[in-house]
Amino acid sequence: MAFPPNSWRPTGPLPTSSLSLRWRVMMLAMSMVALVVVLMAVAVYAVVSRALYDDLDNQLHSRARLLIESGSLAADPGKAIEGTAYSDVNAMLVIPGRSIYTANQQGQTLPLGEPEKDVISGELLMSLRTANHQRVLAVHLANGSSLLISKSLAPTVQVLRRLGTVLLIVGGIGVAVAAIAGGAVARAGLRPVGRLTEAAERVARTDDLRPIPVVGSDELARLTEAFNMMLRALAESRERQARLVSDAGHELRTPLTSLRTNVELLMAAQEPGAPPLPEDEMAGLRADVIAQIEELSTLVGDLVDLTREDAGGITPEPVDMADVIDRSLERVRRRRNDIEFDVDVIGWQVFGDAQGLGRAVLNLLDNAAKWSPPGGRVGVRLHQVDHMHAEIVVSDQGPGIPPEERRLVFERFYRSDAARAMPGSGLGLAIVQQVVLKHGGALRIDETVPGGNPPGASVHMLLPGQRIPDPGATRSAEGFVDDRGGHTVATE
């Protein structure tokens, strides 16, 4: 059975784990506590067991030493061995070739194995071992006799069993307390994470970009603040996108409507039986169509450049701003060969987006050329401000920009009343500002001739970078080197 392309799609998020993070934290706490409890229990059991066995061995050694040093074994061995029956030990005295004396507790028999036989035969001086649930000590005496003493391990085993029970209960309580504490800590610690999760789900479900309240100053508070920064950036991006779409639609509607009207007139004039239009009107319509197509092309190009700058992801590279100015001047000069350019530039390198910087400089020059009268002059200067910054100044002899509009001209699609009669999309200076700010620079607008009539406009573009070593030389727009040390060069 064949499935159509793209017929299968996941219906929801894939599960990441069978256990929630809270349960995993609690299980981790339980596991760590259980491991510590087991290690401590084993250590305590081993230490106590060793201590009990050492105490039992010391008791056997003390009892044997007491019997030997008292002399009762030599004086009356039978009575001395019988006396041990009233204590808690089993005893045996072996006198080779004569007799064996024994005294056992009720229900017990002193074990006699190979180690004890080796002591009796004199092959070993002493042996100590565990046999038949008893601790057995055998000592070979100086007179050739052998003394054997044993004691039941039942009391010791009972103490160790009780100790194991206590350790098990205490360990279980510790693990349970650790589970409860781990759950409480996980619940309290993951509460901000839960708020972040709810916020993310709310954003995905409703597009609600309200920030989350930040509580405290710990790592989770920093995570919340970072998430809020992401929400603010997303809100700004959506606002810019909506504004761009709205403004672009508005700006495209006018030239498209005019273009459609002109095309319909041209088509109607070509229909059979239609009255012919005068040639001058036909030429005017065709010129209008071409102008409107060029306006649309410019607007679409500006929109592409603007969205390109918004998208980012551009690999920076060293850019020689003098070369950028040279190339931009060549393009502007082809469009406006009726004005002169006074160029005074130095070698200055900026680490950034070559295409974006070129577009910014070209827009400044285009704007200055657009507002300059025929035969006017446009000044282009690139000079060093300090050891880290240089400034590009583009000056024209146009009507200037009123102070109240100098901030607005960098807004997208903003066009003053005077600018609406001129070609353009209202995006040129917005692109300039976006490029300059992305490179860590700044923009300002002054009058070319303060108080003049017309005052003109000078746009100052400050860019960080470094000087390109070229002592005693200034580059012109034509690419030659002027050895006069930075004099103004006029090009046409």
Curated annotation (Swiss-Prot):
Gene3D superfamilies: 1.10.287.130, 6.10.340.10, Histidine kinase-like ATPase, C-terminal domain. It is found in: Cell membrane. Residues 470-492 are annotated as: Disordered. Its cofactor is Mg(2+); Mn(2+). Residues 1-27, 187-492 are cytoplasmic. One of its GO terms (cellular component) is plasma membrane. GO terms for molecular function: ATP binding; phosphoprotein phosphatase activity; phosphorelay sensor kinase activity. Its EC number is 2.7.13.3, 3.1.3.-. Pfam families: HAMP, HATPase_c, HisKA. The chain crosses the membrane at residues 28-48, 166-186. Autophosphorylated. Residues 187-239 form the HAMP domain. It is a multi-pass membrane protein. CDD domains: HAMP, HATPase, HisKA. The keyword Lipoprotein does not apply. Residues 49-165 are extracellular. This is Signal transduction histidine-protein kinase/phosphatase MprB. The gene is mprB.
